[in-house]
């Protein structure tokens, strides 16, 4: 299995010539803009999804997508992964266990237009999975610890290099139970950032029950569903949740905290 270097200081963005207007005057300048490119995910030689993503950490993205979308149930079902930049985009090829591949073919997903959001690309509402199984997480109920949330909120900005440079990226951070940020991934799509993090957890052999996810975005349905499917016990977000995200989190036993700041947060499930 090949893995790209995890050096992202100047990747994921490009510099463009712009005209900057301020206080009635104009001047030529340069601006850094986040990159967005089509990424095709290919399973056992068959293209399954094409999504728009920041071209960073794509092998983590593919593994996380496979797990969070239920294509594979565990890391051991992924045998090999390779990635290349081709035809103006990127292609990530995964070799997965045959039973998982046969089940994937039966799901009748669209071969193009997927966004990674868990809804786009399905063929009917009947195929939409809104009934998650309870997560196999900690034995007791999980709730958001105020000190841990405050620490995560304080530490996250230092891990948002792409956002600071471009103003155009979401971050998904893995935090220890004490709230310390252990790793963070950025992408123009919040669901992509989370999939990259989920892929990293799987490839590093991390236990999802040993920490929580802290995100710079709102809490949407697909984020709650991805956390539920991969056994993450707590999702904390800076912005608001949707009603469906709250419902999914409650059904799955995922603790959900939003409007997370250093000074407080709102707990929607526990």
UniProtKB/Swiss-Prot annotation:
Keywords: Cytoplasm, Molybdenum cofactor biosynthesis. GO terms for molecular function: sulfur carrier activity; sulfurtransferase activity. The keyword rRNA processing does not apply. Coiled coil: none annotated. InterPro entries: Cytidine_deaminase-like, FdhD. One of its GO terms (biological process) is Mo-molybdopterin cofactor biosynthetic process. Its main location: cytoplasm. This is Sulfur carrier protein FdhD. It comes from Chromobacterium violaceum (strain ATCC 12472 / DSM 30191 / JCM 1249 / CCUG 213 / NBRC 12614 / NCIMB 9131 / NCTC 9757 / MK).
């Amino acid at each position: 299995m090949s893995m790209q270097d995890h050096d992202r200081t100047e990747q994921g963005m490009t510099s463009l010539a712009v005209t900057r207007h301020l206080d009635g005057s104009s001047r030529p300048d340069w601006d850094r803009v986040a990159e967005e490119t089509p990424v095709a995910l290919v399973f056992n030689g068959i293209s399954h999804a094409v999504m728009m993503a920041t071209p960073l950490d794509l092998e983590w993205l593919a593994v996380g997508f496979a797990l969070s979308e239920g294509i594979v149930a565990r890391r051991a079902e992924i045998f090999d992964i390779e990635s290349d930049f081709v035809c103006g985009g990127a292609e990530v090829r995964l070799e997965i266990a045959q039973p998982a591949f046969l089940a994937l073919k039966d799901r009748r997903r669209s071969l193009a237009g997927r966004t990674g959001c868990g809804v786009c690309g399905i063929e009917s509402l009947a195929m939409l999975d809104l009934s998650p199984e309870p997560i196999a997480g900690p034995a007791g109920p999980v709730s958001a610890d105020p000190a841990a949330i405050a620490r995560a909120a304080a530490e996250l900005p230092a891990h948002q290099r792409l956002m600071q440079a471009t103003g155009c990226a979401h971050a998904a951070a893995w935090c220890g139970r004490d709230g310390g940020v252990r790793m963070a991934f950025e992408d123009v799509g919040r669901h992509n950032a989370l999939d990259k993090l989920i892929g990293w957890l799987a490839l590093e052999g991390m236990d999802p029950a040993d920490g929580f996810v802290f995100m710079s975005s709102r809490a949407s349905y697909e984020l709650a569903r991805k956390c539920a499917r991969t056994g993450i016990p707590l999702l904390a977000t800076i912005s608001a949740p949707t009603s469906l995200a709250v419902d999914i989190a409650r059904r799955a036993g995922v603790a959900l905290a939003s409007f997370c700041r250093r000074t407080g947060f709102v707990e929607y499930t526990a």
